[in-house]
Amino acid sequence: MAILDFGSQYSHLIARRVRELHVYCELYSCLVSVEELAAHNIIAVILSGGPSSVYEENAPHVSKGIWDLLATRNVPLLGICYGMQELAHVFGGQVAPGQKREYGKAMVHRIEGCNSTILQGLPEEFQMWMSHGDKLHQIPLGFKKIGTNSIIY
């Protein structure tokens, strides 16, 4: 598994949690080269959070070559915070500033009827930590919303 780091203070914690599940993972910069990732048998990718906004001029973005590589290999993706916004931004969704920043504990609610394997073993509602100022206004075509929080600005 590869974790692409967009500057989150929690990227190492994400990697540790994945390893605690006995899954081998490596932490890479979000600017990793296609050649470096292609040299590994990547089974899944997590895109971390980060302090930027995807629509800012100098925001970090994964290269198109990486997206092509992952699509060719049919690699599942999980975007967390900025990582989710990066996926939406790249694949035709809409990300914009929220009405106000969100910071602190929040409850995630699984979408009723969702049988995504990524949430397998988790309760219908669980606590998470959030820190962001942007909002996903439109999900990209072909993507599926599997959870939400009740704090939406």
Language-model segments: residues:
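Short beta-strand segments
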Residues: 3, 130-131
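Short, charged N-terminal beta->alpha structural module
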Residues: 1-21
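Cofactor-binding loop segments of dinucleotide-utilizing enzymes, especially the Rossmann-like FAD-
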Residues: 4-6, 30, 82
